[in-house]
């Protein structure tokens, strides 16, 4: 008998078909998962000529309302081996009930729910495709072992660590720790066939748009063993212009940056205590610090007493100036984007909405072609579909709840019309176009045959 490392739990090899009226699980087998036809409710924008008998073969973007397990089973027949990028954001199983999802499933039921879906998702991936699973710390450990089993541990790529909120934003004071990190597990369908897309320097060039103009000689002091020129607020000007390689990036000195690099530590140790002496909005030109080859770095004290943090300005690091491509970092700070996420798409999805910035990063890790398919079977408010559409990719989104109609449908209509200028729209120059089909899963073909007398019980 072959031995292997695996998770074991009750009903592992069964399929959770749903919950009864008392909230107890209804278990079945894979054979109980019957493929369904799609029934179109609405065609939005530009779609291919109608062939309503088989919407799976149309090649149009699909927004599907219905149980995602049944929908995935239906897609498997037509899309096996065709999906380039799959992103899912399943319920985190935190026990925190919120409006749009049952986020408190019993632990083993949650694992069974995930296993059945992961097995089909694996079959849908193209040989060079990637699966991305968004999760927090509650189920991360168990999920990692489960996905290793389903996808193959050798196909694990990395875990993308997301900073989703600032550590100084305390949500609940009675917790042992303040959670600011979430995770995205990344798996290839076949690791040897997978090519991750590296980033070019131009990706971050938009941040380098600041220029510091000095109007006087300032005064020179020795601060912390470094030569520092100090300027009053009326002796300098910060100009924001078009991004270029000779401009500077402004960095807010907050959170981990305070202790995470030499600039943050210097500011906290030597410049913060000088605010009372030098005054607010003082500019410091500190010599011999930074890795951008300039030989100095500008620091600014907080503007006034209403502000807690200062800033520093840096150029493009030397090691990146000559590099045409750089590997993706497995850490992404999306705190600023999360602060604006409720504005995105014109729909509200509190506590569960994901930012378009994140989905753009994930899709572009693996997808480069307009022929690539992107799938999200826990579509939520429609972010994955919206981003895939704006990036010119083909997409399929599945959502069970009523918000398929109240959130996803109106959001994606605004994307098609070009009305949606939130999220990544301005970054990618989105003006509208394309289209999709809004569908529901049809009735059980087996049940219909029984009712029509085509199948009879003896």
Where do the PLM segments sit?
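Conserved proline-anchored active-site loop of SAM-dependent methyltransferases
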Residues: 81-96, 147, 374-388
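Active-site-adjacent helix-turn-beta-strand microarchitecture at beta-sheet edges
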Residues: 2, 177, 190-345, 356
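Glycine-rich adenosyl-nucleotide cofactor-binding module
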Residues: 52-74, 336-375
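Conserved phosphoryl-transfer catalytic core
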Residues: 403-449, 454-457
């Amino acid at each position: 008998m072959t031995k292997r490392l695996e998770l074991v739990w009750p009903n592992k090899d069964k399929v959770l078909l749903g919950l009864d009226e008392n909230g107890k699980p209804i278990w079945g087998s894979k054979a109980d998962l019957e493929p369904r036809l799609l029934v179109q409710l609405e065609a939005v924008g530009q779609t291919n000529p109608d062939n309503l008998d088989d919407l799976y073969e149309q090649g149009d973007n699909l927004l599907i309302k219905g149980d995602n397990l049944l929908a995935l089973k239906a897609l498997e027949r037509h899309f096996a081996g065709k999906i380039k990028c799959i992103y899912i954001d399943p319920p985190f199983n935190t026990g925190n009930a919120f409006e749009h999802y049952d986020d408190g499933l019993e632990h083993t039921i949650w694992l069974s729910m995930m296993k059945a879906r992961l097995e089909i998702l694996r079959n849908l991936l193209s040989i060079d495709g990637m699966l991305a699973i968004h999760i927090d710390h509650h189920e991360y450990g168990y999920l990692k072992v489960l996905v290793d089993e389903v996808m193959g541990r050798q196909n694990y790529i990395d875990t993308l660590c997301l900073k989703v909120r600032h550590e100084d934003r305390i949500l609940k004071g009675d917790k042992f720790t303040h959670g600011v990190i979430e995770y995205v597990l990344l798996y290839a369908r076949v690791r040897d066939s997978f090519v991750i897309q590296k980033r070019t320097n131009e990706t971050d060039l938009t941040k380098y748009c600041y220029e510091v103009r000095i109007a006087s000689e300032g005064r020179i002091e020795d601060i912390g063993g470094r030569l520092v020129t100090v300027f009053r607020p009326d002796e300098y000007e910060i100009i924001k212009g078009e991004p270029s390689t000779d401009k500077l990036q402004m960095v807010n000195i907050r959170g981990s940056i305070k202790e995470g690099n030499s600039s943050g530590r210097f500011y906290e140790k030597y410049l913060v205590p000088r605010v009372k002496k030098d005054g607010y909005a003082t500019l410091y030109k500190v010599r011999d610090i930074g890795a951008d080859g300039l030989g100095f770095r500008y620091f600014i004290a907080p503007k006034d007493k209403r502000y807690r943090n200062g800033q520093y300005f840096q150029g493009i690091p030397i090691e990146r100036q000559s590099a045409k491509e750089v590997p993706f970092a497995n850490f992404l700070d999306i705190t600023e984007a999360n602060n604006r996420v409720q504005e995105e798409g014109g729909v509200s999805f509190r506590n569960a909405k994901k930012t378009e910035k994140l989905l753009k990063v994930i899709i572009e890790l693996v997808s480069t072609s307009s022929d690539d398919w992107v799938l999200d079977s826990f579509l939520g408010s429609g972010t994955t579909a919206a981003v895939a559409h704006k990036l010119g990719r083909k997409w399929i989104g599945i959502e069970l709840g009523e918000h398929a109609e109240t959130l996803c449908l109106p959001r994606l209509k605004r994307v098609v019309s070009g009305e949606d200028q939130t999220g990544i729209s301005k970054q990618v120059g989105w003006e509208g176009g394309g289209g999709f089909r809004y569908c529901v899963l049809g009735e059980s073909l087996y049940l219909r045959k029984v009712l029509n007398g085509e199948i009879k019980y003896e």
